[in-house]
Amino acid sequence: MNYVEITMMINHELEPFIADILNEVGANGVVIEDSLELQKGRIETFGEIYELNPDDFPEEDVRVKVYFSELDYDASVIEQIKEKVDALNDVDVTRLEFSTHTVQEEDWANEWKNHFHAFKVSDKFVIVPSWESYDGLQDGEHAIHLDPGMAFGTGDHATTSMCLKLIEKYVEKGQSIVDVGTGSGILSIAAHKLGAKPIKALDLDSVAVKVAEDNFEKNDCLDAIQAEPGNLLKGETEKRDVIFANILAHIVDMMIDDSYALLNDNGLLITSGIIEEKEEMIIDHLKGVGYTIVEVMRDSGWVAIAARKEA
């Protein structure tokens, strides 16, 4: 079977949200090539730094390759993508360009392995693609096995990596978790690795829920994490110790009141996906409902916040 490859050029602000959009329009796979990757180090199977090939990356901004089977492809999909991007009110979209061509199935399948390798995302977590073995774990480190491109959250973007750093710092064994907008399931997997339970992973997109379940299975935690479709915290009644929310700022803003009501005393909200321009608005709302700000992290124009519901 052949595939239609749509190549998109986008600005960095759009990158954290593009994979979910492409899932919603039925993409079979996504490869994201970020020009900033050339500035980062990576680790191979035995821990050594390896060199990225500049020819594999755009000189600026972000190149996204999205794949559809020829049987499923409809030319209207580009208009669908544009409409969903237009609906992202908090994102400054300065570049959105498209081109298409047909590729052989074997070429498409190999794209994943050319662009995603094991890397250490924080002190305790190493992200490992499912086709690679990794023997370099040190004491206290945990491997998170993922397939990239199917839902947002490979740990490589600032929003996800900051969440992981806050999780490893504050989440404790035996704490109950709800993960709002789970995407790839990476944050739930990290919490499980630290001994948290029970864990519930929610996502409005049923495709993302399936992706998360696949990744839970890869990490031997499918039975330990309850994954299901969910619209933020609507309908949730069981109190939790920690809530994760790596989603857009205006969506975070919508769920702050519900999150406070759902947390146990001394419970923690860990949230990211917030652009710096929205930081003050989110912090003011958090404080307004009673949260105490525990920590604020910033990276590449993005903000992550840990906020506690004091007893």
Swiss-Prot record:
Keywords: Cytoplasm, Methyltransferase, S-adenosyl-L-methionine, Transferase. One of its GO terms (cellular component) is cytoplasm. GO terms for biological process: methylation. Signal peptide: none annotated. Its EC number is 2.1.1.-. It comes from the Bacteria. It holds the Pfam family PrmA. The keyword S-adenosyl-L-methionine applies. It catalyses: L-lysyl-[protein] + 3 S-adenosyl-L-methionine = N(6),N(6),N(6)-trimethyl-L-lysyl-[protein] + 3 S-adenosyl-L-homocysteine + 3 H(+). One of its GO terms (molecular function) is protein-lysine N-methyltransferase activity. S-adenosyl-L-methionine binds at residues 160, 181, 203, 246. InterPro entries: Ribosomal_L11_MeTrfase_PrmA, Ribosomal_PrmA_MeTrfase, SAM-dependent_MTases_sf. It is found in: Cytoplasm. Belongs to the methyltransferase superfamily. PrmA family. NCBIfam families: prmA. Methylates ribosomal protein L11. This is Ribosomal protein L11 methyltransferase. It comes from Macrococcus caseolyticus (strain JCSC5402). The lineage of its organism: Bacteria, Bacillati, Bacillota, Bacilli, Bacillales.
